[in-house]
Regions:
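Ankyrin repeat A-helix N-terminal signature
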Residues: 1-3, 30-36, 62-68, 95-106
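Conserved ankyrin/ankyrin-like repeat signature
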Residues: 5-6, 37-38, 70-71, 111
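Ankyrin-repeat positional consensus site
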Residues: 13, 33-35, 45, 66, ...
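Ankyrin-repeat-protein effector appendages
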Residues: 97-190
Length: 190
């Protein structure tokens, strides 16, 4: 990263703290993607907390999408709009749920809690997305690194509770030697 002293010096020399790059991303936006402590410094120096990029994404959107709870909290505490919509019509909460997968479930639950506590609005689509996160997680459960499994499980339970979603049944795989017992009835109900 760029040393704080250099950031301060550049601003003192007249560099526009909100100057966008080709994609409309400001220095604050870029640092929010990385979850860097420089976010706090840029805000203290006057960076525009709500300035979106070319696609309408704010620094809060990308801090959430890249799973940086500490940065999300800082941006919320400094007044970022939790209901700002990007060009796809997604809020930071909708965005983090859209990109959530496997080992990031715990961070997603933490970020979702912060955003909801700050006034972010839930939608029916979010409830459906949480259910899909659960289905995807259960399908891939056996392939998830055991070091992350407990945190992901806890995060998933938190998401289920936050969005009032019935937990997806845990996937049971055959061990290759136990007898297979088939329930009576048509195959769709088994």
């Amino acid at each position: 990263g760029v040393p704080d002293e250099l950031v301060i010096w550049l601003i003192e020399q007249g560099l526009d703290i909100n100057i966008p790059d080709y994609y409309g991303a400001t220095p604050l936006y870029r640092q929010a993607i990385l979850g860097r402590d420089t976010v706090k410094l840029l805000l203290e120096l006057g960076a525009d907390i709500g300035k979106p990029n070319t696609y309408g994404e704010t620094p809060l959107h990308v801090a959430a999408e890249f799973f940086h709870p500490k940065t999300v909290k800082l941006l919320i505490d400094k007044g970022a709009d939790v209901n700002a919509k990007n060009d796809m019509g997604r809020t930071p909460l909708a965005s983090v749920l859209m990109v959530c997968r496997g080992i990031y479930i715990a961070q997603t639950a933490e970020i979702a809690t912060m955003l909801l506590d700050a006034g972010s609005k839930k939608t029916p689509a979010m409830k459906e997305k949480v259910e899909n996160i659960g289905k995807d997680f259960e399908f891939h459960r056996e392939g998830i690194n055991p070091d992350y499994l407990e945190a992901a499980d806890q995060g998933l339970e938190k998401l289920y509770a936050l969005f009032d979603v019935k937990p997806v049944a845990k996937r049971i795989t055959h061990d290759g030697s136990a007898p297979i017992l088939v329930k009576e009835g048509i195959w769709e109900e088994q």
